[in-house]
């Protein structure tokens, strides 16, 4: 078995009693009924498609009820992350974000992109922002130049998004993302990436 198969085999099943008898769900499907989506692991195209599909499904179920996005991610693909971000902004329901563990790179951008006043971290979460990474490019000098220009445009776009959601000016964002900038939950709150640090569930 590969890692994905092992991980899937370890996902718990929940059995519910209904008028029609028993029904079993994997734990994530059961939580989806409560409008909870998990964004866990590397941000890549397949995972992004699943998150986008869940956001659209929950909007179709009830366009006026909040969706809760739990994030534990080291980041990943910028384009995949932006597809999730754009969908969060596009749909009608507010998307509340919660960092559990870590939200780094694109994970941090998605955390900050939650609905205003509804962005949270658990106390021992870590958040990290940085500029988009340019992998080991190969090819002609002209191709490398094209990709270098694209990465600069992406950097500007991501800085603008972070500035919009944090209230920090572009110059501050550009300086702070020039290298990896790590923050604990309180620092992330002070920076404007989140609104509150939660150590207990707020009832009601």
From Swiss-Prot:
GO terms for molecular function: ATP-dependent peptidase activity; ATPase binding; serine-type endopeptidase activity. The gene is clpP. Its EC number is 3.4.21.92. One of its GO terms (cellular component) is cytoplasm. Cleaves peptides in various proteins in a process that requires ATP hydrolysis. Has a chymotrypsin-like activity. Plays a major role in the degradation of misfolded proteins. Keywords: Cytoplasm, Hydrolase, Protease, Serine protease. NCBIfam families: clpP, PRK00277.1, PRK12553.1. It is found in: Cytoplasm. Belongs to the peptidase S14 family. It catalyses: Hydrolysis of proteins to small peptides in the presence of ATP and magnesium. alpha-casein is the usual test substrate. In the absence of ATP, only oligopeptides shorter than five residues are hydrolyzed (such as succinyl-Leu-Tyr-|-NHMec, and Leu-Tyr-Leu-|-Tyr-Trp, in which cleavage of the -Tyr-|-Leu- and -Tyr-|-Trp bonds also occurs). InterPro entries: ClpP, ClpP/crotonase-like_dom_sf, ClpP/TepA, ClpP_His_AS, ClpP_Ser_AS. CDD domains: S14_ClpP_2. One of its GO terms (biological process) is protein quality control for misfolded or incompletely synthesized proteins. It comes from Hahella chejuensis (strain KCTC 2396). The active site is at residues 105, 130. Coiled coil: none annotated. Pfam families: CLP_protease. Fourteen ClpP subunits assemble into 2 heptameric rings which stack back to back to give a disk-like structure with a central cavity, resembling the structure of eukaryotic proteasomes. The keyword Hydrolase applies. This is ATP-dependent Clp protease proteolytic subunit.
